[in-house]
């Protein structure tokens, strides 16, 4: 039973860590998780997938420019009418790491390289305390 596993118990903290560490927005990360589950997709499928997310005109180009979405097959105007995309290896590794952290196979990093642990703001200190609490919880 998924409820007894408590898979989403610490999802918010893990999501905020991933977004802060990799300079993503919450909607970007959730959209990348969605497309990682789909596999291959077109630009039109991307447009259909973004209807439920906040409007961001530059999201597509930003995700491509930063290497989160890559071309799987290029359009050639004769036999392939459109370009097919997929999430990059970097993106799939991030999503796999999020799953491992949620399942308790891996802890959130607490080294000084972590922007949140090393941060000086109040929200960073609160998040750092939450990260330590997540790492202590071995029943996640």
Segments (PLM) and residue ranges:
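Short amphipathic alpha-helical interaction segments
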Residues: 50-66
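Short, locally clustered residues in the helix-turn-helix/winged-helix DNA-binding domain
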Residues: 30-37
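Short acidic, hydrophobic short linear motifs in intrinsically disordered regions
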Residues: 37-50
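Short, cationic-aromatic polyanion-contact patches
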Residues: 21-25, 74-100
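A short, conserved structural fragment
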Residues: 64-77
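Short alpha-helical segments that sit at the start of domains
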Residues: 1-30
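Short, amphipathic alpha-helical interaction segments positioned at domain boundaries
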Residues: 89-126
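N-terminal intrinsically disordered, low-complexity, charged/polar
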Residues: 123-140
